[in-house]
Amino acid sequence: MNAVSALDADEAHGAPRARRIGALALRLAKAALDTLYPPTCLACRAATDRHGALCPRCWSAMRFIERPFCERLGTPFEHDLGQGLISPQAMADPPAFGRARAVARFEDGPARTLVHRLKYSDRAELARPIASWMARAGADLLADADLLIPVPLHAMRLWRRRFNQAAALTAEISRRTGKPCNLAALRRIKATRSQVGLSRAQRAENVQGAFRIAEGAGVRGLNVVLVDDV
C-alpha cells in the first residue's frame, strides 16, 4: 500500500465519523432550540412533539378533502359512486379551468385559522406545511403541469399585506415538486373587493377584467397550474 492509498483509507474511515459528529451536532442544536422555543401546534398553540405540526386535536378537526370528489371542481361527494365522476354543478355550468383541487373544507377550525394567519398575521412560515398539503391534494394536477403561477394581489393590497401568500405557497410547492414557477406571469390590473361572502356568480363578476398575462411571460401552450390560498 502506498502513501496515497493509505491516505484514501484514512479518509474513508473518517467520513462516517464526521457524519456521526454532524448528526450529533444537529440533534444537540434541535434539543437546544426546543428548550428555548418549545414546539407548539400551528393552529391552537398546544404543545406538540415537533415544530411545524398540528396537535392531535387540530389534526382530527382538519376536514381534508379525499376521493370521492368531482374530478372537475374537486368538491367532495357524499357517497362513493366510482372514479372519474363529474358533479351536476360542473355539468350544468362548466368552469373555465380544467380541474381544481383543494386541501380541506374551508370552515371554522384549523384550516381557516392557518390560512388567516398566513394572510393577515405575517406568518409566512405557515406556507411550508400548507404547501406540503397542497402538493399532496393536487398531485394529479402537478404531474401534468408545465408551470406554476400564483394568483397575484393588486399593488395596493400587496403593500398593505407586505407579501403575497399565494406566491409564497407557489414557491414552496415548486421547491417540493421540482416544477418550475413564474411568480410574475400574471398581473392584477384592477383592484377588486374581497371575495368573502360572495356567491360564485358574484365572484366571477368581481374579478372580471382584473387580471392580465404579463408581457413576455411565455405561457402560451403550457399546462399551467394556478395557485391560490382559498
Which positions does each model-derived feature cover?
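Glycine-rich phosphate/pyrophosphate-handling loop used in enzymes and phosphotransfer proteins
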Residues: 1-230
